């Protein structure tokens, strides 16, 4: 019985966090596509608030330009009563992202900047995920 109580105590403090993102290899300008946000269980309270979506040149040095998302193409609210989507405790959720009609065709990094708050200390920040996409006519 003690083991069950301990397990439930830890489980109640666990929360999901976004740990990766994926998208189709080819996307069409002026059209929406579905990007996938993948989540896992985290041992502390963890809130992902939203994702800023961007397209950047494929040669963007993300180590030298920490926090850069390139051209902002969208935002997805993940928090509260008016969230655009609900991130599951562990799994995947699809998010609609639209490529601007005036985006030049070519290869880009699709970058997702996910804002978060974690733990009792209230640490905030962003996690960044990227994948290469080909923008087509």
UniProtKB/Swiss-Prot annotation:
**Record-linked Pfam families:** Nis1
The signal peptide stretch is 1-16
Q: Quote the subcellular location field of this record.
A: Secreted; Host cytoplasm
**Quick check: keyword Secreted in the entry?**
yes
Task: Please list the residues annotated as glycosylated.
Answer: 38, 61, 130
Query: Superkingdom of this entry's organism?
Result: Eukaryota
BAK1/SERK3-binding: region residues: 107-136
Q: What happens when the gene is disrupted?
A: Severely compromised the virulence of M.oryzae on rice and barley.
- Chief location: secreted
What are the record's GO terms for cellular component? extracellular region; host cell cytoplasm
The protein's UniProt keywords, in alphabetical order, are: Glycoprotein, Host cytoplasm, Secreted, Signal, Virulence
Q: Function of this protein?
A: Secreted effector that induces necrotic lesions in Nicotiana benthamiana. Interacts with the rice receptor-like kinases (RLKs) BAK1/SERK3 and BKK1/SERK4, inhibits their kinase activity and suppresses INF1-induced pathogen-associated molecular pattern (PAMP)-triggered immunity (PTI) in N.benthamiana. Also interacts with the rice receptor-like cytoplasmic kinase (RLCK) BIK1 and inhibits its kinase activity, thereby inhibiting PAMP-induced ROS generation. In PTI, phosphorylation relaying by RLKs and RLCKs is critical for the initiation of downstream signaling.
Domain description from the entry? The C-terminal region from residues 107 to 136 is important for BAK1/SERK3-binding and the host cell death suppression.
Subunit note: Interacts with the host pattern recognition receptor (PRR)-associated kinases BAK1/SERK3, BKK1/SERK4 and BIK1.
Give the protein family: Belongs to the NIS1 effector family.
Q: What is this protein called?
A: Necrosis-inducing secreted protein 1
Q: To which species is this protein native?
A: Pyricularia oryzae (strain 70-15 / ATCC MYA-4617 / FGSC 8958) (Rice blast fungus)
Gene name for this UniProt entry: NIS1
